[in-house]
Amino acid sequence: IKGNDGGSSVTALTIDMSAAGAATFNSTVTENSDERLKSNIHTIDNALNMVGDMRGVYFTKDGVAGTGVIAQEMEKVLPEVVKENDEFKSVAYGQVVGVLIEAIKELKKEVETLKEAS
């Protein structure tokens, strides 16, 4: 695939698809994140509580072991990361990163407060 759609530039890309629907790319997959494309930008609050409400799971899908989350559970915590097609729900894992970053920062603040108190 070659092209430039104004937001992503691809010069050479190989995608290997498995029968189970897994895709392997020979390059990095990125998502547009330019500030100029976004509006209503604000920091995520209560991220640590959100992470506390998430459940990481081990599972087997199509005979292959994996780790992740359950879309129906994530929908209750962070509905904007759950997508649905005709049959199944999926999770945009990359969109969870902002919550994880802010949760780590909240933990860091708590650790610093505890260190100062001791």
Language model: regions and residue ranges:
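C-terminal intramolecular chaperone/autoprocessing and neck/assembly modules of extracellular spikes
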Residues: 23-94, 107-118
